[in-house]
């Protein structure tokens, strides 16, 4: 979604167009998702972007052709949201018998893919994919156990979970992750600046 001073745009694919119109009413203009790429609908603006929600490639393709971008480290929607959930509750692991495969094997398979295709890093922005890779769940959404987080995986099988540290208590006690593998979203830009140069998928 793009929230402007006088207009709001919601981008979605054809499956959700009718539902989006019903739920958003007159508050948003509904557009097909593909129109967000270098769109002329909004231009000559300074757009605030949460860097934890987009890759640099997405920011370039979606917003930079006709606009300027300012990086905002705090999620403004979270600051004003009246929806209260168990956002401070720790993520938890699900058993291999439920997941079907250990997270170690999943990490190995994906890292091998990166090596074969000459990528150094995989940046995962979809929380459901983080949930699959690490076999974890959370309490962020009252209707879904998806753990709101991002993740960076290296071709050397290094895992960095990008999430508030208070959500990782159980994962740390299980020794699934170490302290240095937890990256607070507020410092994500500093984290990326310290990475070795390489290609990101």
Predicted features, each with a name:
Residues 2-201:
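A composition/biophysics-driven feature that prefers long, compositionally simple stretches
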């Amino acid at each position: 979604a793009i929230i402007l001073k006088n207009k709001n745009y919601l981008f979605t694919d054809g499956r959700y167009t009718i539902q989006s119109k019903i739920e958003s009413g007159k508050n948003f203009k509904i557009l097909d998702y593909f129109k967000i790429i270098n769109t002329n609908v909004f231009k000559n603006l300074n757009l605030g972007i949460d860097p934890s929600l987009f890759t640099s490639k997405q920011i370039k393709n979606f917003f930079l052709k006709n606009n300027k971008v300012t990086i905002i480290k705090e999620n403004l929607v979270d600051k004003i949201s009246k929806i209260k959930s168990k956002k401070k509750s720790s993520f938890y692991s699900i058993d291999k018998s439920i997941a079907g495969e250990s997270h170690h094997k999943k990490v190995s398979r994906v890292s091998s893919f990166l090596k074969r295709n000459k990528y150094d890093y995989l940046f995962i922005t979809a929380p459901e994919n983080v949930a699959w890779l690490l076999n974890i769940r959370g309490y962020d959404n009252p209707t879904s156990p998806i753990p709101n987080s991002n993740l960076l995986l290296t071709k050397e099988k290094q895992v960095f979970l990008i999430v508030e540290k208070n959500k990782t208590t159980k994962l740390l006690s299980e020794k699934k992750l170490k302290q240095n593998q937890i990256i607070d979203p507020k410092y994500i830009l500093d984290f990326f600046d310290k990475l070795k140069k390489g290609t990101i998928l």
